[in-house]
Regions:
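ATP-dependent small-molecule kinase phosphotransfer cores
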Residues: 5-54, 59-66, 91, 104
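NTP-dependent small-molecule kinase module
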Residues: 44, 109-142
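Hydrophobic/aromatic beta-strand patches that form the interior of the parallel beta-sheet core
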Residues: 4, 70-72, 120-122
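Short glycine-rich anion-binding loops that position phosphate/pyrophosphate groups of nucleotides
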Residues: 53-55, 77-79, 127
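A glycine- and Lys/Arg-enriched "phosphate-lid" helix/loop adjacent to the NTP-binding pocket
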Residues: 67-111
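Short amphipathic alpha-helical segments
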Residues: 60-63, 85-87, 134-135
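A conserved segment at the C-terminal end of the G1
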Residues: 1
Length: 142
């Protein structure tokens, strides 16, 4: 199976990171590119996608997540999420004065979409990456 990280693919296609895409093209254009790339790639088989949290803002993407394969919501507390995000990169929606408040608001706005689009939920607050992978594999019986 091929692993596709949607954010990385959008960054590669534009030769800039998400922070710069947001600054130069805006969030709307990023969401448009993110959705178009995901929809196109989802036509193929035997793939594992890593998506950003905003993928659920597009109805077609939600339908694909729910109806074409098995989707996992990797859930974590806002403080844990912020620490994880800051370890890997700057993200425009949390590069603000009060990032915890921003994450909480994003969760409130998207929570229903996340639950509607997933088949399984894994609480990741206290899990290592290996433990999350083990849970994923157990749930898909690999």
């Amino acid at each position: 199976m091929e692993h596709i990280d949607i954010d990385s693919e959008v960054e590669y296609a534009n030769q800039m990171d998400i922070q710069n895409i947001f600054e130069t093209m805006g969030e709307g254009k990023f969401r448009e590119m993110e959705s178009a790339f995901f929809i196109e790639k989802a036509k193929q088989h035997d793939q594992i996608f890593s998506t950003g949290g905003g993928i659920v803002l597009n109805d077609d993407c939600c339908d694909i997540l729910k109806n074409k394969g098995t989707t996992f919501l990797l859930k974590a507390d806002c403080k844990v999420l912020l620490n994880r995000i800051n370890e890997i990169s700057k993200r425009p929606l949390v590069d603000v004065k009060n990032p915890i408040e921003s994450l909480s608001l994003i969760w409130e706005q998207r929570e229903e979409l996340y639950y509607k689009s997933c088949h399984h939920i894994i609480e990741t607050d206290k899990l290592s990456i290996d433990e999350v992978v083990d849970e994923l594999l157990q749930k898909v019986n690999i």
